[in-house]
């Protein structure tokens, strides 16, 4: 294989390794809504999605704040 082909293969392997796995992205969200935004320092990243939070907690996004919170339920 030529050096150009090897570089292309190496580049593609690097891109593939950097991709985020999609295994948990098609799960449904947990029930309930996120409560109002808390008063916290900016840009706190506690979670990536509902399933990275314990129990019934949801991953709530408030701008650059992502944190696990107990859900609220609206009738």
Swiss-Prot record:
Keywords: Antibiotic, Antimicrobial, Disulfide bond, Secreted, Signal. Its main location: secreted. It comes from the Eukaryota. One of its GO terms (molecular function) is serine-type endopeptidase inhibitor activity. GO terms for biological process: antibacterial humoral response; innate immune response; venom-mediated disruption of cell wall in another organism. Disulfide bonds join 34-60, 43-64, 47-59, 53-68. The lineage of its organism: Eukaryota, Metazoa, Chordata, Craniata, Vertebrata. Belongs to the venom waprin family. The keyword Cytoplasm does not apply. Gene3D superfamilies: Elafin-like. Expressed by the venom gland. PANTHER family: ANTILEUKOPROTEINASE, WHEY ACDIC PROTEIN WAP. Residues 27-72 form the WAP domain. This is Textwaprin-a. It is found in: Secreted.
């Amino acid at each position: 294989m030529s050096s150009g082909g090897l570089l292309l293969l190496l580049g593609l392997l690097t891109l593939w390794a950097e991709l985020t796995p999609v295994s948990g992205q098609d799960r449904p969200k947990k029930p309930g809504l996120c409560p109002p935004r808390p008063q916290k320092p900016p840009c706190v990243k506690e979670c990536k999605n509902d399933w990275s939070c314990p129990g019934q907690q949801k991953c709530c996004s408030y701008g650059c704040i992502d944190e696990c919170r107990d859900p609220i339920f609206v009738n």
